[in-house]
Amino acid sequence: MSEFAPICIYLVISPLVSLIPLGLPFLFSSNSSTYPEKSSAYECGLDPSGDARSRVDIRFYLVSILFIIPDPEVTFSFPWAVPPNKIDPFGSWSMMAFLLILTIGSLYEWKRGASDRE
């Protein structure tokens, strides 16, 4: 049992360390609002109206997919950022193939009109 004592202590202390900061605001806060401005609309000045769960147009998702394309491109381009005389032919051709696949995908989305606004 003595070899498990540090683990038991950790299992008791770690929830306390995380729950105490979560509980402190409830102890020190007051429910009475003396300032009506605190419950008013923030910044825009308009009271919310309508349903918050409105439908989102599918074109929003297409545009978000278009912005995902540069992320792996940049990530996979970092190892390629070495002097040209230090890149072996396999690394060079694999990067060219990767860029070709990304270019074909971008051209396909462009041809399909994914970035067109209506």
From Swiss-Prot:
Q: Which residues cross the membrane?
A: 7-27, 87-107
Its UniProt entry gives the catalysed reaction(s) as:
a ubiquinone + NADH + 5 H(+)(in) = a ubiquinol + NAD(+) + 4 H(+)(out)
What is this enzyme's class at the first EC digit?
translocase
Q: Which InterPro entries match?
A: NADH_UbQ/plastoQ_OxRdtase_su3, NDAH_ubi_oxred_su3_sf
Give membrane topology per the record: Multi-pass membrane protein
> Where is the protein found, in the record's own terms?
Mitochondrion membrane
> Gene3D superfamilies this protein is in?
NADH:ubiquinone/plastoquinone oxidoreductase, chain 3
An annotated Gene Ontology molecular function: NADH dehydrogenase (ubiquinone) activity
**GO CC terms:** mitochondrial membrane; NADH dehydrogenase complex
Q: Which UniProt keywords apply?
A: Electron transport, Membrane, Mitochondrion, NAD, Respiratory chain, Translocase, Transmembrane, Transmembrane helix, Transport, Ubiquinone
- Role of this protein: Core subunit of the mitochondrial membrane respiratory chain NADH dehydrogenase (Complex I) that is believed to belong to the minimal assembly required for catalysis. Complex I functions in the transfer of electrons from NADH to the respiratory chain. The immediate electron acceptor for the enzyme is believed to be ubiquinone.
Family, similarity comment: Belongs to the complex I subunit 3 family.
Q: Which PANTHER family match?
A: NADH-UBIQUINONE OXIDOREDUCTASE CHAIN 3
**Protein name (Swiss-Prot/TrEMBL):** NADH-ubiquinone oxidoreductase chain 3
| Organism annotation | Solanum tuberosum (Potato)
Its organism's taxonomic lineage begins at: Eukaryota, Viridiplantae, Streptophyta, Embryophyta, Tracheophyta
Q: What gene is this protein translated from?
A: ND3
